[in-house]
Design a protein with these regions (language model features):
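Short, extreme N-terminal leader segments that mark the start of a protein/domain
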Residues: 1-71
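Short, basic/low-complexity N-terminal boundary segments at the transition from targeting/disordered tails
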Residues: 31-34, 74-79, 157-163
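Short linear motifs in intrinsically disordered
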Residues: 43-48, 92-94, 107, 169-170
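Short, well-structured alpha-helical interface segments that form or flank functional binding sites
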Residues: 50, 91-94, 159, 200
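Aromatic- and glycine-enriched beta-alpha-beta binding-site module
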Residues: 58, 66-136
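A contiguous, surface-oriented mixed alpha/beta subdomain in the mid-to-C-terminal portion of proteins
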Residues: 103-249
Length: 249
C-alpha cells in the first residue's frame, strides 16, 4: 500500500484508534504553512477567505485547477504568520486547521483507491507526549469528534471545489496573470513578481451563453467567481502587511 501525502505533508500513515497524537495549539501555524505563500481552500470557504486573502487559481498542467489563498508575495513567505501563530482576527483556512490529520489517496496493487483514508503526519504520533483520541473502550473523545467532522466536511467540500474548477476550466474562463509591486524605498524598494496564478476573465465571462450562465448560477459558481474577483483587491493589503514588517525580514 502506498499513501500519497497531500501538499505540505511529509510522511503520513493511517490513523489508528490506539495512537496518541500531538495536536497543534489553537491558531498554531503548521510548519509547511509558515514557509508557504499560498494554501488550498475549499468551496464554502470563499466568503471568509475573500475578506483577508486574495483568492487565485493554480494549475500545474494548465487543465486542472484548484483555488488557493495567497499568503505572501515572495516564495516561502506567509505574511499572516506572526509571533508563532496565525495573525489575530484573521480566518485560518481549514487546510491548516485539520493538520496533522488529512484524508489521503491510497494506491493498492498499483491501483488508486476511490475512497480516501484518514491519515496523520507520522512525526505527530507520540506515545509518550501525545493524547489519546479514543478511550480504552474504543469510544471517540470530544476532540476526535470535532476533528473527524472537520475532515469529513472538508473532504466533501473539496469535491464541490473540484466540480467548480472543472466547470470554470471547461468554459475557458481562466487566464494567467502576474502581480507586480514595488516596496517603498525606505523598505528596500524591492520589486516583486508573483506568477503561476490564474484569474477569471470578466471579458470571457460576458461572452458565455445563457445556458452556461444559468449553470454557473445553479451550481453556486457565479457567486464564488465574484468573491474571487473582489478578493484580488487584497493584494494591496498583502503589500501593506509586507511593508509593515521590519526590512530585515
Amino acid at each position: 500500500m502506498r499513501i500519497t501525502p497531500p501538499f505540505g505533508y511529509e510522511e503520513v500513515v493511517p490513523f489508528l484508534k490506539t495512537q496518541k497524537v500531538c495536536l497543534l495549539a489553537a491558531r498554531e501555524v503548521p510548519g509547511f504553512a509558515q514557509r508557504s505563500n499560498a494554501i488550498p481552500i475549499s468551496h464554502t470557504e470563499f466568503q471568509l477567505v475573500a475578506r483577508e486573502y486574495p483568492i487565485v487559481f493554480t494549475g500545474g498542467d494548465g487543465k486542472t485547477f484548484a483555488p488557493v489563498a495567497v499568503l505572501g508575495l515572495t516564495a516561502g513567505e506567509n505574511l499572516f504568520f506572526a509571533g508563532g501563530a496565525w495573525a489575530p482576527g484573521v480566518y485560518v483556512p481549514a487546510y491548516a486547521r485539520r493538520y496533522p490529520f488529512c484524508m489521503a489517496k491510497v494506491t493498492l496493487d498499483k491501483a488508486q483507491q476511490k475512497d480516501r483514508l484518514i491519515c496523520i503526519e507520522k512525526a505527530f504520533v507520540d506515545e509518550q507526549r501525545g493524547e489519546a483520541m479514543f478511550d480504552a473502550k474504543g469510544q471517540p473523545g470530544a476532540k476526535w469528534v470535532e476533528i473527524e467532522r472537520l475532515l469529513s466536511e472538508y473532504e466533501g467540500d473539496l469535491e464541490r471545489s473540484r466540480e467548480m474548477c472543472s466547470i470554470v476550466a471547461d468554459y475557458g474562463l481562466l487566464e494567467p496573470f502576474t502581480m507586480q509591486a514595488t516596496l517603498a524605498k525606505e523598505k528596500g524598494g524591492a520589486a516583486m513578481h508573483v506568477t503561476g496564478m490564474h484569474r477569471v476573465s470578466e471579458k470571457k465571462l460576458e461572452d458565455l451563453n445563457a445556458a452556461q450562465l444559468k449553470n454557473l448560477l445553479r451550481k453556486g459558481v457565479m457567486a464564488r467567481i465574484y468573491m474571487h474577483l473582489l478578493s484580488l483587491e487584497n493584494f494591496a493589503r498583502l503589500l501593506e502587511r509586507k511593508a509593515a514588517r521590519p526590512a530585515a525580514s
